[in-house]
Amino acid sequence: KQAETLDAIQNGADEIDYVVNLTELKEKNYNYVQKEMTAIVETCREHHVLSKVIFENCYLTREEKIALCQIAREVQPDFIKTSTGFGTGGATFEDVELMRKTLGDSVKIKAAGGIRDLETALRMIELGVSRIGSTASVAIVEELIQKNKA
């Protein structure tokens, strides 16, 4: 993954998203997960590129989410991200609350997947999300514009 990260950067990427190794995480090989995260985040930092670590929360237990947040708190990627949007579930309020509580303010959170309306987007922001990934972003902005006109 580190070589792929460097290749993407050399080909013009200014942000890198990568999914943690779920097999190693499920095996509780947290040392491996931390080393991989560190290698990718440091490669991004060296080239002034944003790093986003995707948890894919829909496949994780509460314990695994907490462990990943603790690792991220040490490694300091620019963002942690709830999901790719391709898994069995997207961002939930519960997950975002847990991530923010465990991380503190040291790492930004991107909520992705399942955010389809203004109310949900605003609630995510209230919970501490810095970015939202949504295929409904245009509809959400249009809803905000209409709300502000009223």
Model-derived features: positions:
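Short hydrophobic "strand-cap" motifs at the C-terminus of beta-strands
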Residues: 112
